[in-house]
Amino acid sequence: MNDNTEPDFSLIIASAVHDMKNSLGMLLHSVDSMCDELPEEWRKKPNVATVQYEAERVNSYLVQLLGLYRLQNKLLSLHIDEYYLQDLLDEQAAHYTQIFQSKNIDLSISVERNLTWFFDREIILGVLNNALNNASRYTKSNIEITAKIDGKFLLIEIHDDGKGYPEKLLAAPPGEILNDINFNTGSTSLGIYFAAMVTKLHVQGDLHGHIKLSNGGRLGGGVFSIYLP
């Protein structure tokens, strides 16, 4: 008997994205290893940083697409554990050392002493990775990451000294941000939508995780805020 059932194209795409993400991860690891072996003056070359930055950006998009597919199909589950924020943010910052140095961007981290919190590490790292990618793209010369307790929430913020978020983006609810996709300007806002969807999976009682976009902050530019209950 012939099976005429059409294949699920979204599943095919998800499988392809998963394979591409793994391959790109290996490529990123190889690039980092090669950069470690380069003379100091070569590491700061713009072309080296561009390869790292663009590869990280593509990898971030693939992670988001795969995460949203799993979320839509109820396949995304949280793996909650307790983490030290200082260690987590230091690790993430180290990942961007070469990129920031080549762009003459100063990165600082301010965390409340001995601050720990419960959350899904991989999901939050994905959100932070996208926020740092965006900040490095639009900042002038400074980025600051802060983490503190804000009421019943852990508040992580990424501040930059760029021009800030457009008013249209600030006015749109994060969950509806994809309505403003503009392929002509390269603004898909996929990262913001992904962050909004996955942070709200973090629930404590009647409190839900969420994000907030604002301007001003500690450096006068854009502020990307992550609230986790």
Listing of model-derived features with the role each one plays in the protein:
Residues 26-41:
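Conserved C-terminal segment of the DHp
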